[in-house]
């Protein structure tokens, strides 16, 4: 399931002694963080990437590696894993170094304008610029609060689907009313390698915060007796011999029903946690970092924020928007890296210089 990262990348990350001096540090290895490497690389700016996960890809890999994504330009459909793998391949020419499984714990500005940065594993950097591309920060799933249920977390209680095949042939209860709950419900009901034995969807009300087409399809499957939908909330459970056997679902009518299961999947969304980012002296609005829209720079010169972590008038949380932000942020950062150099806009279609950077031959047209 993990993305196809070159083992030499992580080996390089482990070979440093003392502070690492670099042009740029990118905090977050999701799609926007990875594309930030590409845009910086075109300007010959070297970058190191830090992520709290043990693998690149961010939410795409952690939350929906197998879900289809339809809004990437010129790519009619791809999964989160495919998008991550393609981005990793795209940035290979730039030799970015990954520092995975660690979080940034300290950022201080030096007298010379650069930044001291340290991670939870003690990795230290001296960098000219910082790019925060950490999605919604360090995100955690919102938990189903039923006393004692957490003992089954990771065995029969799941807040993420890492391996869909593990649920094939099982009796599933899925709790939630958003896109993730509906998408996985449809995935496990319909014919395919991951088809479950049975699926019961539980939501506290009859309304959903999901795509109308998904809701309509779910109701169609219920009418065909291929699955069941129950309006109610999980208020308890039954277990024997250390195994979760059923959940108790209390409906709006006050009646509690016992629902047998093999696996319980809960999709209540994410609880964003900015963590140490909140202590960097940045302007923060509703747990998002305020930026300008010229360079996507924060109120601290030299620190940029791209992707879902930032906020500005008209902000849309789309991967496409993050790619655009990464391009402008790279140009905005260039004067910090090359203060005496004038940066010219070049095109990968025609620039021999960029072709050399990318390691490709310049085409010759008749």
Curated annotation (Swiss-Prot):
Residues that span the membrane, as ranges: none
Cofactor: FAD
First-level EC class: oxidoreductase
UniProt cofactor note: Binds 1 FAD per subunit.
Pfam short name (any one): Pyr_redox_2
Keywords per UniProt: FAD, Flavoprotein, NADP, Oxidoreductase
Family: Belongs to the ferredoxin--NADP reductase type 2 family.
Protein name: Ferredoxin--NADP reductase
Lineage: Bacteria, Pseudomonadati, Pseudomonadota, Betaproteobacteria, Burkholderiales
